[in-house]
């Protein structure tokens, strides 16, 4: 299943700029989201308020990603990323300024977070599709793993540092740090220079893909008919539905069930990031042949981590489960991105990623709203544990009844060649 990756360096000019832009942007995201999260908690909104925040954070991005995908050409990917960074910078400036002026009702903050989320519909598909343009095919998995592991180290520092700021100063002042980070990230993206990579089989067909509507439909058709991506998308739905209770209720779980302070929540997130970094580092050193098997296995392990976390309040065991959950995150994201980049031609990658992202992430806001009310009735821990059970059962089903876990790298390449003419 795995072999050591050859030592060809991916650290060249374009990847360096992408690398630093991504880690700075992730830092900005951490500061922005956690500041608003604890603002709602301090304001007495509790589980329902945080659940609504999760809903408006994920839903616009998920819905709009397929809509913006057909506009993305290989030559304009970095400009979509730049636009996203500038828009998010504006959002994190408006919220604290209005709060200082005495105007910060919940509906206003939620509206701005909808816009904040919508920009992800451009940034994420563009950044995923950009990697094969600046890294050779043999280095794609390594590039994904390096970005994933480094992102977790940044989260480790950013979440902990943000927790410290939130403990001593207000969330509004903490958000101003995110403003600077978003501006720096957007500035770095502009230095990326590349020539669009287009295969011979692709160039002969790409002009026949039609208008905007045709490209929009093509993205959904590719996912539906793809023997690897279709079960991947289905399992993503269950994975995100299972993750919704943790995403929506983890802060409330720490505050109410564990009687912890914001710094405990931040340390728990930091432990998760450490687990993700460790496995991301390993995946940067070994070459995986069966990405689907790694993806499904990681999902099942993630489900067990949710179950363990929700069923007990013994803090050391909760931290161990958080570390395991973090490791599973890398083991899910790296193969998911690599499967898309390997089994779909470059012109279709932004749209295919956007479609899978939409299909899977629709379950997050729905699950977040449901679990917010369920937590009031049954408790946050039990709801988190139920999410883990859902993910375990779904993973076993995907493992037994689909081709996802059986596919090797050669199968992904065959699917890519077939998809060009679809």
From Swiss-Prot:
Gene3D superfamilies given in the database record: MFS general substrate transporter like domains
Designated gene of the protein: yvqJ
Name of this protein: Uncharacterized MFS-type transporter YvqJ
Keywords on record: Cell membrane, Membrane, Transmembrane, Transmembrane helix, Transport
This protein's record includes keyword Protein biosynthesis: no
Domain of life, source organism: Bacteria
A single cellular component GO annotation: plasma membrane
TM region(s), chain numbering: 23-43, 47-67, 90-110, 112-132, 151-171, 172-192, 228-248, 263-283, 291-308, 318-340, 352-372, 381-401
GO biological-process terms attached to the record: response to antibiotic
Subcellular location field: Cell membrane
Disulfide pattern: none
Organism of provenance: Bacillus subtilis (strain 168)
Stated family: Belongs to the major facilitator superfamily.
């Amino acid at each position: 299943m795995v072999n050591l990756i050859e030592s060809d360096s991916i650290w060249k000019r374009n990847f360096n700029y992408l690398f630093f832009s991504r880690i700075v942007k992730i830092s900005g995201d951490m500061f922005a989201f956690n500041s608003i999260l604890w603002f709602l908690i301090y304001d007495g909104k509790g589980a329902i308020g945080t659940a609504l925040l999760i809903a408006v954070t994920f839903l616009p991005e998920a819905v709009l990603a397929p809509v913006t995908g057909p506009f993305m050409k290989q030559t304009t990917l970095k400009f979509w990323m730049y636009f996203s960074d500038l828009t998010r910078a504006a959002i994190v400036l408006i919220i604290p300024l209005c709060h200082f002026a005495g105007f910060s009702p919940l509906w206003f903050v939620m509206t701005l977070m909808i816009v904040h989320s919508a920009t992800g519909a451009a940034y994420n598909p563009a950044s995923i599709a950009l990697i094969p343009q600046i890294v050779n095919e043999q280095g794609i998995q390594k590039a994904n793993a390096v970005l994933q592991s480094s992102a977790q180290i940044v989260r480790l520092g950013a979440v902990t540092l943000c927790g410290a700021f939130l403990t001593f100063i207000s969330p509004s002042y903490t958000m101003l740090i995110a403003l600077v980070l978003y501006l720096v990230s957007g500035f770095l993206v502009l230095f990326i220079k590349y020539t669009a990579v287009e295969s011979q089989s692709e160039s002969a067909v790409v002009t026949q893909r039609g208008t905007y509507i045709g490209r929009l439909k093509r993205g959904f058709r590719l996912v539906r008919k793809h023997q690897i991506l279709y079960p991947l998308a289905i399992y993503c739905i269950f994975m995100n539905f299972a993750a919704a209770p943790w995403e929506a209720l983890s802060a409330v779980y720490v505050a109410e069930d564990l009687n912890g302070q914001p710094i405990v929540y931040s340390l728990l997130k930091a432990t998760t990031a450490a687990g993700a970094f460790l496995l991301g580092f390993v995946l940067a050193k070994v070459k995986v042949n069966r990405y689907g098997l790694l993806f499904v296995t990681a999902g099942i392990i993630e489900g067990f981590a949710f179950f363990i976390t929700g069923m007990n309040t013994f803090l050391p065991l909760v931290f161990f489960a958080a570390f395991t959950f973090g490791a599973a995150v890398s083991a899910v994201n790296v193969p998911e991105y690599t499967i898309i980049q390997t089994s779909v031609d470059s012109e279709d990658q932004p749209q295919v990623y956007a479609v899978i992202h939409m299909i899977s992430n629709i379950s997050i806001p729905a699950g977040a709203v449901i679990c917010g009310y369920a937590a009031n009735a049954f408790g946050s821990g039990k709801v988190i544990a139920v999410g883990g059970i859902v993910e375990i059962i779904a993973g076993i089903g995907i493992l037994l009844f689909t081709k996802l876990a059986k596919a090797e790298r050669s199968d992904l390449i065959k699917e890519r060649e077939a998809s060009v003419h679809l």
